[in-house]
């Protein structure tokens, strides 16, 4: 199910990093994702195929997610984890992310491993667990730094003398990737890009509450929608009817679970590990809600997928004490899931709207072609186009002034926006689209041709 094209800007940056890692040139963007890129680059060197390299990491990540989810089940002394395993394995978003040229799924596997050792620390207070916890946190910083706020509640460990082993493990594993990254980037360059990109993420382009126009209400709606619609194929407008069946099952499981928790059992003797689990997810929820791009990037909700899968597992268990009945319920729930996931994975193998534009321009036979677009799309086309007859220009006032020159030289002009200066020219519009539930970013694009 691996893909063979760059579906968006972020995928391109990670794909290019496998060939030539350079944070200064956004291959990939800061903070560099050094450990992920190191692994990706080495697998790519063996396979010479970025799709296979990415899906290999994705496959290992799925294995680790399921393995340590089972370990967590046993650690919490819960039974019948088989339902959750199947729900996770057939999850459409996990399948898509396992093939996307990004570190998110690998980061999720590390988050679950790290959380497992945090719970072990709470239950057993062993030095080994403190050390491993610190090491994995350091590795996580080199794979998916934005998942680290999940562990802010673990700061309570500072009152335990053994936390020094976690600090030691963190310093060793972080130093193993950060020192080489600073060395190859240059100390001054690293500080400069750290300052610029950190400020840019929070205040300019990062899609945070400080840089976007979306209200807190809209951000909350998007977050919940992404968790259920993208994460678990809940019904939404223009989706296949099978998502309605899927949604009914999810609602039934949730209602049954909440009845069991709040009406049949009194919330007594809540253990510390349960409180910490709640606080970890609350911490990450607040972080994503305020400081991540949830306008069109559902991938930031990935840590909630194992939690919802666990809740669905418990919902199935709460409906019946008879295992045969549970198995029937699970099969009926998974049948539409298999259909939905299969369709989304097949659609993912087809080009995104942005990649379709690239293919369209590659097939342009005219010897004189110029493309006007915004900076991000120009970056994408500049790194992917094979057609050497095409000039790429950013849409700005200075380049607008060159329009007359290209017209006089008989250039064919393409633009991602309508050009008022060419209103007298013959205009053709081309439409490119993909399923937004495969990738929310730029699912519909237009290209305007002037001759």
Task: Enumerate the language-model features and the residues they cover.
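Short helix- or helix-capping micro-motifs
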Residues: 84-92, 116, 137-141
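Perimembrane helix-loop-helix junctions
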Residues: 120-124, 149-174, 179, 183, ...
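Short acidic/glycine- and proline-prone juxtamembrane loop motifs at membrane-interface regions
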Residues: 30, 99-107, 297
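Signature aromatic-anchored transmembrane alpha helix within multi-pass, membrane-resident enzymes
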Residues: 82, 128-135, 168-172, 310, ...
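Transmembrane-helix motifs of polytopic, lipid-linked glycan transferases
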Residues: 56-77, 113-117, 253-259
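Membrane-lumen/periplasm interface segments of specific transmembrane helices
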Residues: 164-246
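Membrane-embedded, lumen/periplasm-facing catalytic core of multi-pass transferases
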Residues: 329-403
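Hydrophobic, aromatic-rich transmembrane alpha-helices
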Residues: 225-274, 278
């Amino acid at each position: 199910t691996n893909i063979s094209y760059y579906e968006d800007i972020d995928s391109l940056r990670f794909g290019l990093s496998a060939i030539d890692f350079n944070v200064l040139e956004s291959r990939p963007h800061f903070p560099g994702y050094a450990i992920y890129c190191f692994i990706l680059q080495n697998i790519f060197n063996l396979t010479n195929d970025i799709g296979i390299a990415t899906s290999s990491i994705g496959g290992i990540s799925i294995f680790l997610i399921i393995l340590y989810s089972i370990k967590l089940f046993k650690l919490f002394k819960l039974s019948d984890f088989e339902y959750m395993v199947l729900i996770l394995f057939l999850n459409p978003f996990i399948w898509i992310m396992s093939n996307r040229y990004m570190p998110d799924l690998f980061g999720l596997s590390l988050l679950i491993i790290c959380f497992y050792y945090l719970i072990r620390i709470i239950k057993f207070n062993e030095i080994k667990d403190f050390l491993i916890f610190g090491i994995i946190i350091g590795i996580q910083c080199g794979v998916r730094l934005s998942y680290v706020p999940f562990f802010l509640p673990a700061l309570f460990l500072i009152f335990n003398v053994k936390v020094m082993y976690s600090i030691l493990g963190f310093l060793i594993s972080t130093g193993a990737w950060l020192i080489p990254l600073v060395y190859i980037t240059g100390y001054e360059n690293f500080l400069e890009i750290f300052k610029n990109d950190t400020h840019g993420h929070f205040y300019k382009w990062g899609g945070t509450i400080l840089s976007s126009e979306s209200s807190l209400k809209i951000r909350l709606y998007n977050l919940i929608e992404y968790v259920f619609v993208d994460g678990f194929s809940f019904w939404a407008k223009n989706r296949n009817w099978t998502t309605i069946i899927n949604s009914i099952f999810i609602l039934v499981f949730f209602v049954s679970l909440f009845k069991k928790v709040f009406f049949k059992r009194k919330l007594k003797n809540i253990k510390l590990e349960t409180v910490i689990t709640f606080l970890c997810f609350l911490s990450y929820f607040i972080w994503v809600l305020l400081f991540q791009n949830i306008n069109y990037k559902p991938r930031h909700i990935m840590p909630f997928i194992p939690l919802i899968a666990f809740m669905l597992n418990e919902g199935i268990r709460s409906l019946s004490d008879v295992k045969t009945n549970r198995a029937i319920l699970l099969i009926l729930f998974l049948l539409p899931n298999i259909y939905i996931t299969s369709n989304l994975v097949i659609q993912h193998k087809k080009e995104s709207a942005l990649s379709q534009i690239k293919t369209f321009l590659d097939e342009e036979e005219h010897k004189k072609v110029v493309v006007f677009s915004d900076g991000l799309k120009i970056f994408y086309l500049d790194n992917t186009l094979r057609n050497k007859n095409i000039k790429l220009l950013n849409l700005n006032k200075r380049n607008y002034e060159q329009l007359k020159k290209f017209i006089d030289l008989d250039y064919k002009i393409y633009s991602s926006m309508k050009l008022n200066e060419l209103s007298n020219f013959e205009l053709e519009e081309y439409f490119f689209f993909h399923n937004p539930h495969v990738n929310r970013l730029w699912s519909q694009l237009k290209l305007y041709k002037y001759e």
